[in-house]
Amino acid sequence: MPPKKHSGFMMFVNEWRDNNPEGRNLSIAQAVSRCGSIWEKMTAQQRGPYNSGAKNADVLTRVKKERLNCHGQVLSQVELEEREMAESQIHMKRCTERIVMDAKRSHDLENTKFVFVAFNYFTKAFTTDVYVPAEFSASEYSFNEGIMSVYSTLIDPGQIIFGQGSDAQHHSSTTHNLPLPPNALGEKNMGKLYRNILEYLSKIQEGKDATKPFVVFTKTDMVPFVKSCFRYLACENQDGSYENGDQIQVLDIQYLLFIQKKEVLDIAGVSDEKINLYVTDAYFLKDFFEFTPEISCQYHEENDRSKYCTQSLVMRWAYTFSDYMCSDLAISVQPGKHIPPKTKPNYRVIPANSSVHESSFDSFYSIPASCEKKEDSPTVLSPASSRRSLASSPYVPTDHTSFVGDLNKKDEFPSLDQRNKLAALIDLIQFFYRCPVQLCRPLFSAGYHLNDALEPPHDPRDLYGRPL
């Protein structure tokens, strides 16, 4: 039931009871009967404040107080943000699936171009999702051509958020190690940089509908600050045509890897029952090409921070896609396009007759395509295949169970007699250790030596000289 409305008369009754000493001792019914005659004699102007107070009380009753969580945040607002985030994730997945499925239906999946992007940042605002960019890179990739082009630049934002210099210095020293403003390197005009990025994307995605945004892909944990960095650059644009950064849509590259792997296996006619998002994420996060030399920018190559370089990131992602799916599409990989131009092999050759097979979690590039057995080269046997090769081995085992000896004969095992003497010596030492001095002194005065324990006299007597 809806709450009862307040009346001006009851507002007057409550005020009369609070201000009149006589009314404090009366009940509600008695106060109503006493105030009824007074209320009838009041004019409309005198009743006005009480009627307006009743209306205000009705409004306050309808307005409920918002519940807060343990962090002091409005619970309804938090739930709204969670719903928006979930809807955004679903929208990103649907867009990725639509792109891959359209390419598959047109039988042109291996020639479809994808753009991988990455940002480095100096610092993040405490209360908002504003990130100050430090470096940007993008790469154009397709299965058939590999890496087709790379765009990379350092960014000088001019200044960082006030009061966050220490945080920016710590983040920089532990990651990309880029100098902070005002000593930062790279492009200083944010609007010009944003226009250059849009021009680069427009050349890649020719024939795109002008009303639709450019689609780029980045790592899952990078999606929030990549979107924020694009908005940061768009706000500095002078013409104001891309003020909100809506011209670029950022999607999840790890979900793209999962969808592409399933569709590639379907094209190849291979079962994809064992492929799920956890498997593809584990493969992507292994980052087989993390320490590949000469694929980062000059600054990070000289400062030995190529792992955090955005240019190295977008190229390593492209190598991972080629490494994971080019073999399923029967596409021959080319150094510098699908795989790094320089790589130090870190593997051993397993013969073709071995039962050791390549694991599905291993890199396809890290194992040679063919292994030919040479006659003059030594064969490396695995533990699983060594049992089968024993029949052809020249080794003849020897039976060591044919020797039989009598353990009671000292001439066959002379060391056993020495062991008995050693045991007697140990017992004698333990005896002297436990006995008091008064009992041990007569033994030494009688000329008893340790040799007597090893060679006992023919007369069987105990240690005290008594006959046994």
Curated annotation (Swiss-Prot):
This is Protein maelstrom 2. Transmembrane segments: none annotated. One of its GO terms (cellular component) is perinuclear region of cytoplasm. SUPFAM superfamilies: HMG-box. Keywords: Cytoplasm, Developmental protein, Differentiation, DNA-binding, Meiosis, Nucleus, Oogenesis, Repressor, RNA-mediated gene silencing, Transcription, Transcription regulation. The keyword DNA-binding applies. The keyword Metal-binding does not apply. Pfam families: Maelstrom. Residues 374-393 are annotated as: Disordered. Residues 2-69 bind DNA. Involved both in the piRNA and miRNA metabolic processes. As a component of the meiotic nuage, plays a central role during oogenesis by repressing transposable elements and preventing their mobilization, which is essential for the germline integrity. Repression of transposable elements is mediated via the piRNA metabolic process, which mediates the repression of transposable elements during meiosis by forming complexes composed of piRNAs and Piwi proteins and governs the repression of transposons. Belongs to the maelstrom family. Residues 381-393 have a biased composition (Low complexity). Its main location: cytoplasm. GO terms for biological process: germ-line stem cell population maintenance; male meiotic nuclear division; negative regulation of DNA-templated transcription; oogenesis; piRNA processing; regulation of miRNA-mediated gene silencing; regulatory ncRNA-mediated gene silencing; spermatogenesis. One of its GO terms (molecular function) is transcription cis-regulatory region binding. It is found in: Cytoplasm; Nucleus.
